[in-house]
């Protein structure tokens, strides 16, 4: 079976423990009640260093055998590129980020799993853990609910393929209650069935690591606690575009609610994809024009219909309690406590393309919102990072002109990264966070704290709850040979649990 790799290297750097006995106690507690429960016991409202999450304990592969075990966490690493270290005096705001959950309908005819064998840009078309995306989102919410937060920001790609039933499931998880993840027939119908002869797909009933009955359990209803804090949506390319790349059409809508699911491309189509003749946009067209290869029969389901971009944006607005009728773009502001103004900027294209875009009118809007923030600290949220988005340079220039910007926080790239950006106003931090769908499957928590020299942004990763099928998802994601571990998506030590110092605001140098 080609998809899982048992020769896994340790994907998490471990800090040297300050006290052997302290870490033994923490590890024992984590083993007994789960690493995420330790977060609830260790999160403080003051300036202490023991924040919980992966600062206390996390999952590691100690001996490289591909099996994750509880291990010590990573204390906050102080980063002083923009300002010197200073004593923490108190908390101004606490918030969290969930990104790229990619809640998906793994049985949908609109998926293109067969392109995964080509690798490269199609390396995430199929994942061995993809039947468990809803359970992972619910487990991440449960872990964050143990923290006292002013808000949770969902920075895009909440769903994978803009289908109505994907939105139904994802939004129900955020709202809380009984979740039914199934579509079509109650039994599993998809490429991971034991009856599918293609050895490329991981089939948990027959392939190692064997998980008999996993697909059936993945279809069963489960309970989601719902986000306890207010939550705020950011729209991503997979929320609005087919396969995250093209606008829906009559053809793609027909395929999504149909009964034929492509399993394997024919030799001609596979050769074209391997040679680069098939890009992500062509993949959507491929679905709509003939299914060139072996397919399987699945039970059709009208709930798989594809949303329009406007429908998706309005659905997100209403679910988060933002009201309706706010325009085509999901640009808005909100407050995190009394000291922080959050600005959400919609970087998602409406026609085609996965890359981010910032329109000129959005830059003007952003400048107005920065002025309106007054004396509040400012955090900007996008799906695609501004630095890699078309027009993002102008948005960054607007942020450079503010003395109150703390960070620009994004998802999309499925990787942890924390980079300083120097500016005339003193500088701020560019932060991206790994996804919930690929290893390491973590959320990110933040605290903005006062210091003797200004402020600091503390940020650390949070493992999802260990007591559900989400744990199986993390184990499979760790073994995915095209997944987050071999691609280094967890980032370096400096990209994970850090305290980011900023200086007292000063006049902007022009």
Features from the language model and the residues they span:
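Terminal targeting segments of Actinobacterial cell-envelope proteins
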Residues: 1-19
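Metal-dependent phosphoesterase/phosphodiesterase active-site architecture
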Residues: 3, 10, 43-145, 150-151, ...
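N-terminal Sec-pathway targeting helices
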Residues: 14-30
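Hydrophobic alpha-helical membrane-insertion segments, chiefly the h-region
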Residues: 31-42
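Active-site neighborhood of phospho(di)ester-bond hydrolases with catalytic His/Asp-centered motifs
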Residues: 97-99, 151-157, 227, 232-237, ...
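Active-site environment of divalent metal-dependent phosphoester hydrolases
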Residues: 104-105, 160-162, 239-244, 351-352, ...
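Metal-dependent catalytic neighborhoods of phosphoester/phosphodiester hydrolases
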Residues: 154-175, 204, 216-219, 242-256, ...
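Active-site-proximal segments of metal-dependent phosphoesterases and phosphodiesterases across multiple
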Residues: 349-364, 368-410
């Amino acid at each position: 079976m080609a998809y899982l790799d048992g020769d896994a290297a340790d994907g998490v750097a471990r800090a040297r423990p300050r006290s052997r006995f302290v870490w033994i106690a923490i590890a024992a507690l984590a083993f007994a009640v789960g690493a995420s429960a330790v977060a609830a016991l260790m999160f403080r409202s003051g300036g202490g260093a023991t924040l919980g999450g992966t600062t206390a304990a996390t999952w590691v592969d100690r001996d490289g055998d591909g099996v994750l075990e509880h291990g010590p966490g990573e204390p906050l690493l102080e980063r002083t590129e923009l300002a010197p270290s200073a004593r923490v005096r108190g908390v101004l705001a606490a918030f969290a980020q969930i990104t790229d959950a990619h809640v998906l309908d793994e049985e949908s005819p609109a998926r293109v799993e067969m392109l995964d064998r080509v690798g490269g840009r199609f390396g995430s078309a199929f994942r061995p853990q993809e039947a468990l995306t809803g359970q992972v989102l619910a487990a991440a919410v449960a872990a964050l609910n143990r923290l006292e937060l002013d808000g949770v920001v969902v920075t895009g790609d909440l769903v994978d393929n803009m289908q109505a039933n994907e939105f139904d499931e994802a939004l129900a998880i955020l709202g809380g209650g009984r979740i039914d993840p199934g579509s079509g027939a109650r039994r599993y119908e998809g490429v991971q069935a034991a009856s599918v002869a293609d050895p490329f797909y991981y089939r948990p009933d027959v392939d190692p690591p064997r998980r008999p009955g996993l697909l059936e359990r993945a279809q069963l209803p489960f309970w989601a606690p719902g986000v306890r804090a207010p939550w705020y949506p950011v729209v991503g390319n997979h929320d609005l575009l087919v396969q995250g790349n093209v606008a829906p059409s009559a053809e793609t809508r027909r395929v999504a609610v149909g009964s034929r699911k492509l399993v394997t491309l024919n030799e001609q189509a596979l050769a074209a994809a391997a040679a680069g003749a098939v890009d992500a946009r062509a993949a959507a067209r491929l679905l709509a024009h003939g299914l060139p290869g072996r397919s399987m029969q699945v039970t059709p389901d009208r709930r798989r219909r594809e949303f329009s971009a406007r429908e998706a944006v309005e659905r997100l607005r209403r679910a988060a309690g933002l009201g309706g009728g706010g325009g085509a773009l999901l640009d808005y502001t909100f407050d995190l406590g009394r000291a922080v103004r959050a600005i959400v900027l919609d970087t998602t294209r409406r026609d085609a393309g996965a890359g981010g875009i910032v329109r000129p009118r959005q830059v003007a809007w952003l400048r107005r919102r920065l002025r309106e923030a007054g004396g509040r600290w400012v955090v900007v949220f996008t799906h695609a990072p501004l630095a890699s988005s078309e027009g993002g340079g102008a948005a960054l220039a607007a942020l450079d002109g503010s003395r109150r910007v703390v960070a620009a926080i994004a998802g999309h790239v499925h990787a942890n990264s924390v980079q300083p950006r120097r500016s005339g106003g003193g500088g701020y931090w560019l932060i991206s966070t790994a996804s919930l769908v690929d290893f390491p499957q973590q959320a990110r928590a933040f605290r903005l704290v006062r210091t003797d020299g200004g402020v600091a942004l503390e940020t650390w990763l949070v493992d999802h709850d260990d007591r559900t099928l989400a744990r199986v998802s993390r184990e499979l994601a760790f073994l995915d040979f095209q997944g987050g571990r071999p691609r280094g998506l967890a980032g370096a030590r400096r990209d994970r649990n850090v305290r980011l110092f900023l200086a007292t605001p000063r006049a902007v140098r022009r």
